[in-house]
């Protein structure tokens, strides 16, 4: 298994799909990285040479991925909450942010129902 950005990349998958195992890299960014490096999308990771894997590592290193990206996202949410803006308040109360209704159909964001004690 190749190790890129601290993640074990699956060997038996095509390169374009295998790179999506890294947090912050989807299919589009994966295709862009492979095009920059000059590796075909349909090549399996197990067929790549060490030199090509090193090139992939360098290509992925240009982007914010994994722990750095998770930290950046959580810091952005924390900043909104500290500002006290509307989005920050909605985050703090675990409610939908983007104008969805909450009388019904907000169970995913609100979590399971809490019974009322008598």
From Swiss-Prot:
PANTHER family for the chain: 30S RIBOSOMAL PROTEIN S13/40S RIBOSOMAL PROTEIN S18, SMALL RIBOSOMAL SUBUNIT PROTEIN US13M
Gene: rpsM
GO molecular function list: rRNA binding; structural constituent of ribosome; tRNA binding
InterPro entries: Rbsml_uS13_C, Ribosomal_uS13, Ribosomal_uS13-like_H2TH, Ribosomal_uS13_bac-type, Ribosomal_uS13_CS
PROSITE patterns, sorted: RIBOSOMAL_S13_1, RIBOSOMAL_S13_2
Source organism, top-level taxon: Bacteria
Gene3D superfamilies the UniProt entry points to: 1.10.8.50, 30s ribosomal protein s13, domain 2
Region (Disordered): 94-118
Pfam families linked: Ribosomal_S13
Name of the protein this chain belongs to: Small ribosomal subunit protein uS13
Assigned protein family: Belongs to the universal ribosomal protein uS13 family.
UniProt organism field: Vibrio vulnificus (strain YJ016)
Recorded GO CC terms: cytosol; small ribosomal subunit
Function: Located at the top of the head of the 30S subunit, it contacts several helices of the 16S rRNA. In the 70S ribosome it contacts the 23S rRNA (bridge B1a) and protein L5 of the 50S subunit (bridge B1b), connecting the 2 subunits; these bridges are implicated in subunit movement. Contacts the tRNAs in the A and P-sites.
Keywords: Ribonucleoprotein, Ribosomal protein, RNA-binding, rRNA-binding, tRNA-binding
Subunit structure: Part of the 30S ribosomal subunit. Forms a loose heterodimer with protein S19. Forms two bridges to the 50S subunit in the 70S ribosome.
BP-aspect Gene Ontology terms: translation
